[in-house]
Amino acid sequence: MDSRVALVRKYIAPSVIKSDSIQLHGLVKAPLFKALNSRYKLGSLQIVQDVDWNAKTTPSDSPEPLAATLNSNRSLPMTKFPKQEILEQVKLDTKVGKWRKFMTGWFRIGLYLLKSYKTGIQNTLKVFWDTRNEEQKFSIKNGALANLVREIEMHEINTRLSSSSLPTSSSAKAPLRPLSINRKTLVELIRRDQIWKLPVFFTLVFIFEEVSVLIFTFFPRVCPYNCLTPGGYKKLSNSYIKGTTSTQGNYGLGPLEFTKQGTIKYEPPYAVPIENLYNFLTSFPQSMISNWKLYIYKKLKLQKLLCNEIEKIYQYLFIDDWLLLQSILNTDVEKTKIALSDRELVNCILERKLYHMGDDLNEMVNDTLGKEILLKRLFLYWTLRYNDTISLNGKHTFSEKWGVNNISLLKYNSELVATKDIQ
């Protein structure tokens, strides 16, 4: 007799996700949003700037050791370019004559850029080299993400079977569940393919030197991700969101659809036209496949292969969210501080498309109010997806709540792009 047990995922249509403004107010009152917001207000969750998580020593007040496995600043671009600071230093430098200050200022800006490019190239090489062993163990291209999703699902099922470990609906306390991979390793495995941009990037920098910044500002996709300046990053973020929020139906995954009851509609990847799949994949910041392959898939109408790539993004965001939430909610509010870097916060907002066309995410994260707005958007996004799930504070698995590979969750949801009026 075959002793194997088949695991069947049960789908329960969500009954609280509405299509009007009531949704936003309902999310703010949810236990998960309150728990996340409380940790931020109490200082348990901090947004940290200018910290080298790869350094051998860290500041005495650094929220280590958890942050070192949470952030990968070396694989992300700067959030602030010190242009005005450099010009101000030249202005106050008495050794530089007045007639030379203008040229000297811009010369030093150029040198700073070249130095940042050098650091970016070195970090790209380090990320690729340091993750070589993990890449063999967790091959993203060969189903590693699906295996990690199944691992999380087994955690959820085991929690359900062990009813004593289920949290109350008002606590939003995440039961401790170590995963076989930490977040830093996960995101660096996704970002390691930036190394293939180095030959063209290095050639352009070698030929044009300081002028290359203009090329990378107008053509940011040529530049390795961690070498982008805030100007190039803004142009890139605008290009990503432009197609997503377009009124034309062949952009992104299409408009967010609702059932007659006002709940978010379940939609599998195979229900989406090939053109929409292609446009979404080419606009995702950390693509796991080259654009020329995607173009071939589209031309040959290989919808299954395009759907596979969509599912990888769906799985990656689910795992990334799960690791972040576990880190934030598993800590003792009074004893442990969780540090999420400003670069990681901006990248989370970019990948989940929680911003408007024209938003300067780097400028926002360097402003107190702007940073809070970005965090609230992320909290609302997490609350919509994970409130009332077993991993946090509920009774349903994630698949039961939303269905398997519900790509409606990848669509742009304007209600989650909250403003400063969300407290």
UniProtKB/Swiss-Prot annotation:
Q: Which GO terms describe its biological process?
A: protein insertion into mitochondrial inner membrane from matrix; response to antibiotic
Topological type in the membrane? Single-pass membrane protein
Q: What cellular component GO annotations does this protein have?
A: mitochondrial inner membrane; mitochondrion
Is Transmembrane one of the keywords?
yes
Coiled-coil residue windows: none
Transmembrane ranges, per UniProt, are 199-219
- Coarse class of the protein's main subcellular location: mitochondrion
**Physiological role:** Probably involved in mitochondrial export. Confers resistance to the anti-pneumocystis carinii drug pentamidine. May act by the removal of pentamidine, or its damage targets, from the matrix by an active-transport mechanism.
**Which keywords accompany this UniProt record?**
Antibiotic resistance, Membrane, Mitochondrion, Mitochondrion inner membrane, Transit peptide, Transmembrane, Transmembrane helix
The source organism is: Saccharomyces cerevisiae (strain ATCC 204508 / S288c) (Baker's yeast)
Q: What is this protein called?
A: Pentamidine resistance factor, mitochondrial
Domain of life here?
Eukaryota
Compartment(s) where it occurs, according to its Swiss-Prot or TrEMBL record: Mitochondrion inner membrane
Extra facts: Present with 1460 molecules/cell in log phase SD medium.
Q: How does it assemble?
A: Interacts with COX18. This interaction may be essential for its insertion into mitochondrial inner membrane.
